[in-house]
């Protein structure tokens, strides 16, 4: 469990954390890590590459140094290993666009709503649900394109953790632009998938599916997952990041619906921000749950023991809840009994 804070400096580290976030985002918006990937640079060289004044570039680089993203030696700045692996455009595991576009441009300002959301007094015109948010086609597109990059890592983890070798039909409820479905279909040549998603997201997703050459195996049903008819007799049902974005009062019925739409022997997979039952963390899971509360005030903080019990109560066997993205998400799985 977390060691409790004792000093004012530790509290300041939490209170001023937003400054480090913005330093990272500003560097991403200016392509700084991508330029530094070529090799160490002075502040003047980095500024020239980014089109920024050298002194302001030095101030930004110093902040990045202080938070551990870049190193400084003899006046030259270089990416750390983490920056090179994850923040450089075109790197294999680059998720800079997800951080820059979704987290900074969308999640960051939405967190301004947290006080009102906690008091359940979001003003008229505030974003009060994903349905509100994604009614705007531009917002849906920005979110979806950045989320697609952010979902590929979890999708690869899901391939490793869920046995879908005998599955033919996958239902992906709230499947976004298809990062999960595409990755699963690529790993399992006999699998086909149906994704239920908001129309503005489905439009973006169809293009990703086509680009992957999978339009014959992955189809979309346009609609709100909570109100749309799902196809039955599925071999697998997936809900990834659905629960954190819907009212907590819908959770039990969604688990029952998954059971009802599976064939006997079918597998239910639920991937989301899940904390430990003792409420001690993990830190990123807990913070992401709070983030979702800012624009889904009816959201509920999921914990592993509750999920396991809810799967059991719905009739699933072989129930397990295990960490997926380390320190952030968990994958709950259950099988509908029978052959």
PLM regions with names:
Residues 1-72, 82, 173-339:
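Alpha-helical subdomain
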């Amino acid at each position: 469990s977390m060691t409790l804070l004792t000093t004012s400096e530790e509290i300041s580290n939490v209170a001023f954390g937003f400054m480090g976030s913005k330093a990272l985002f500003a560097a991403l918006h200016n392509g700084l890590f991508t330029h530094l990937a070529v090799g160490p640079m002075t502040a003047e060289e980095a500024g020239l590459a980014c089109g920024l004044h050298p002194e302001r570039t030095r101030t930004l680089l110093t902040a990045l140094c202080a938070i551990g993203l870049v190193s400084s030696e003899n006046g030259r700045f270089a990416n750390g290993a983490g920056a090179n692996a994850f923040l450089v455009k075109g790197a294999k595991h680059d998720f800079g666009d997800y951080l820059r576009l979704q987290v900074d441009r969308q999640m960051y300002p939405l967190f301004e709503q947290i006080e009102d959301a906690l008091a359940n007094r979001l003003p008229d015109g505030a974003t009060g649900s994903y349905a509100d948010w994604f009614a705007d086609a531009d917002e849906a597109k920005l979110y979806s394109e950045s989320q697609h990059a952010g979902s590929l890592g979890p999708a690869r983890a899901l391939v490793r953790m869920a046995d879908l070798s005998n599955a033919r039909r996958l239902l992906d409820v709230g499947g976004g632009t298809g990062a999960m479905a595409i990755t699963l279909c690529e790993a399992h040549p006999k699998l086909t998938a149906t994704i239920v998603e908001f129309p503005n997201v489905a439009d973006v997703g169809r293009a990703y599916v086509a680009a992957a050459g999978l339009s014959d195996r992955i189809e979309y049903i346009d609609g709100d997952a909570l109100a749309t008819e799902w196809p039955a007799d599925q071999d697998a049902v997936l809900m990834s990041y659905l629960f954190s974005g819907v009212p907590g009062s819908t959770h039990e019925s969604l688990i029952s619906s998954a059971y009802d739409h599976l064939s006997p022997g079918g597998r239910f997979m639920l991937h989301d921000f899940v904390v430990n039952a003792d409420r001690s963390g993990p830190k990123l899971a807990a913070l992401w749950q709070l983030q979702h509360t800012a624009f889904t005030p009816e959201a509920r903080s999921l914990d592993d023991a509750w999920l396991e019990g809810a799967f059991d109560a719905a009739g699933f066997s072989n129930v397990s809840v295990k960490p997926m993205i380390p320190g952030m998400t968990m994958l709950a799985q259950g099988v509908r009994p029978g052959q």
